[in-house]
Every structure is written in C-alpha cells, then in structure tokens.
UniProtKB/Swiss-Prot annotation:
SUPFAM superfamilies: DEATH domain, Toll/Interleukin receptor TIR domain. This is Myeloid differentiation primary response protein MyD88. The intermediate domain (ID) is required for the phosphorylation and activation of IRAK. Residues 110-152 are annotated as: Intermediate domain. It comes from the Eukaryota. It comes from Sus scrofa. The gene is MYD88. GO terms for biological process: defense response to Gram-positive bacterium; defense response to virus; inflammatory response; innate immune response; MyD88-dependent toll-like receptor signaling pathway; positive regulation of canonical NF-kappaB signal transduction; positive regulation of interleukin-1 beta production; positive regulation of NLRP3 inflammasome complex assembly. The lineage of its organism: Eukaryota, Metazoa, Chordata, Craniata, Vertebrata. It is found in: Cytoplasm; Nucleus.
Length: 293
C-alpha cells in the first residue's frame, strides 16, 4: 500500500482491503489526512480537489469550507455515499498526485485495514455452529428484549429501531402513540421500553439494527449531535446501506435546531415535523416509509 520510495508509484492495496468501508480508518489516520489536505497550496491538491473527485457539487464544497476541519467533514459525508471505500480513497489520492500522503500514511492505513479485517474475522469465528433446533441469532444475544425468546429460537423483530436521546423521549412517546396505537399498527424498538438491562449497549444496538429491525428512525436534535451512542447507531446503520439504497435510515426533525444539521444525513430525505405546511402529512409519510417491504 505504501510506496517504495520518493516519486515511486504506490502499491495497490489487496482486493479485500480495497473494498473495506471508510469506517475502517480510525481517528488518528483521519486527523493526519486533515493535516495534509486542509492546507491550501499552489503546488499540491488539497481537500477541495478530493471533494471534486468524489463528485461533490460546488455548493456542497462551499458549505464544507465553513467547517473547522473540512477534510474530516468531507470523509464523514462521503462514507455514506455509493462507492465510498478505503481503496477508492487511495485511488483518488493517487490520481491527485498526492504520493506524499500515500507514502506517509500508507503503513497506518494498512494497519487500520488489518485490524478491521481481523476484528471481522474474530466476530465471525465467535459465532457458534448451528444445529437444527437453533435459529441464526447468536445465543448470547438472545433474551435482550422484553418479548424475546430466552432460548433464542424466536427472536423478537421490529419494523423500526428508534435512535434518540433521552431528552427527546417525549417525542418518541408521541411517535409510539401515532404509529403503534393507531391503524398503522407498526412495531417500534425503543431502547428504554423494549431492551432489557445488563448487556453492552453497543452490542445490543448492532444486533437490533442489523438483524431485528427493518428500518431505523433517527430523531435529530441538538442533543442528538452530542450523543456518542446515537453517532455510533447512525454510522452503523449507514454502513449497512451505503448511499441509502435500501431506504434503511429515516431522519426525523421534530423541533428547530440551533446547531447545523448533521452532514452525514444531508443526502437522505428528511421527515420534517417543524414545517407547518407539511405537518399534517408527517405521520402518514413516516408510517408509509416504515411499512415498505
């Protein structure tokens, strides 16, 4: 992955690494990328050139210019779009002539990729062998919700996982009334109500979002932007459906915000409860989106 010397072509990553999602790159590598690409010079392509190669439009680039770390925001925005991968990022850097970045960060990127692949392999190895009487759910992940089968043979499933902050619980309760207790008869997964205590929150969220829930509703607010748990859940759901092709994630804005709407969700159609002109259609639109096959 790293070049062999000054001016040399960088060796391409192995196919398995090329296809890895951008989530494989840790914070340290992203920070060092910012140090290289945030600097505007006449002799080397910066983050704006990379954004153009990623097919960002002019207005999108202008918006990113207002961010304190535009490279980081660019990567966060891009990783949810179709075709985003570690391999593609390296190809674009090479195309822009940034061999200095590839030489300097190549070993670190390669190490991140190895760790990511190893983690995936370890998780796969930890899955027990299946027998006829056991469902595909992981046994240690059985009995995690109120109505779960403790033996794991009939895990509880939901129409949608609700990603929210505790401060937004009143709106979540209204969502329950509008979507569960009406003719829509949808089944929502609300952590404070449905999830049993005593298990790692990250493991439970991953299991529910990936295997138990067909969709995920993100209740976006100023407090949501400060929540590490919500950030993890959102990025995990996006990684399961890059580019939102499967309409898996639905952002909901239910009150005005002082902070900027999260860039990682800007490319997905929002269900806006704050717009008085469309408020009467809000629950119908949301219910219909959650009812899609």
């Amino acid at each position: 992955m790293a070049a062999g010397g000054s001016g040399a072509e960088s060796a391409p990553p192995t196919p398995s690494m090329s296809s890895l999602p951008l989530a494989a790159l840790n914070v340290r590598v992203r920070h060092r990328l910012s140090l290289f690409l945030n600097v505007r010079t006449q002799v080397a392509a910066d983050w704006t050139g990379l954004a153009e190669e990623m097919n960002f439009e002019y207005l999108e680039i202008r918006r990113l210019e207002t961010h304190p770390d535009p490279t980081r925001s660019l990567l966060d925005d891009w990783q949810g779009r179709p075709g985003a991968s570690v391999g593609r990022l390296l190809e674009l850097l090479a195309k822009l002539g940034r061999d200095d970045v590839l030489v300097e960060l190549g070993p670190s990127i390669e190490e991140d990729c190895r760790k990511y692949i190893l983690k995936q392999q370890q998780e796969a190895a930890e899955k027990p062998l299946q027998v006829d009487s056991v469902d595909s759910s992981i046994p240690w992940m059985s009995g995690i919700t109120i109505r779960d089968d403790p033996l794991g043979q009939m895990p509880e499933h939901f129409d949608a996982f609700i990603c929210y902050c505790p401060s937004d619980i009143q709106f979540v309760q209204e969502m329950i009334r509008q979507l569960e207790q009406t003719n829509y008869r949808l089944k929502l997964c609300v952590s404070d109500r449905d999830v049993l205590p005593g298990t790692c929150v990250w493991s439970i969220a991953s299991e529910l979002i990936e295997k138990r829930c067909r969709r995920m509703v993100v209740v976006v607010s100023d407090d949501y932007l400060q929540s590490k748990e919500c950030d993890f859940q959102t990025k995990f759901a996006l990684s399961l459906s890059p580019g939102a092709h499967q309409k898996r994630l639905i952002p909901v804005k239910y009150k005005s915000m002082k902070k900027e709407f999260p860039s990682i969700l800007r490319f997905i159609t929002v269900c806006d409860y704050t717009n008085p002109c469309t408020k009467s259609w809000f629950w119908t639109r949301l219910a219909r989106a959650l009812s899609l096959p």
